[in-house]
């Protein structure tokens, strides 16, 4: 069965972990901050009643989320790694490079970024940059189904297909962008409507 790594467990990472565990998917979590596990417990306690109303999958449980001490352990057997670290390009590049070296070769590496381009994010991914995408959610992640899936110039079609399948199977509505643009689609629509 699928397992997913959530790297960076702030508000967005905790939202993703809540969403995936509510769909019965095993989640491997990592964050450098030791308090992140408490934040997740608080997030999922608040989220679970709303998620129950929307409908949980068979086998859904907050206990599906396991925290790891090392990022390498969190990502090693996953089909998707969802990176949701703070919006600092150098930090994301460093994390994605580490993930790229540690995860399986057919694993999709997705960043939750709301602003950076795949081509910049994947700059230091030397193993398989063709499997890096942006998977940009809307907050709260466990309630709003839309995810923008964005390819970079090196991203392979098979990576996009796999990412779309994983997100769709977890109950997400995927807006697929084959070319990267500044600001993605939904954010631009929001700006245009103002």
Task: List PLM regions with ranges.
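NAD(P)+-binding Rossmann beta1-loop-alpha1 motif at the extreme N-terminus of oxidoreductases
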Residues: 1-54
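Amphipathic alpha-helical segments at domain termini/boundaries
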Residues: 4, 18, 22, 61-83, ...
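Short amphipathic alpha-helical segments
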Residues: 17-18, 41-42, 93-96, 121-123, ...
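Rossmann-like NAD(P)-binding element
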Residues: 32-35, 39, 49-108, 116-117
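Internal nucleotide-binding/catalytic subdomain
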Residues: 188-194
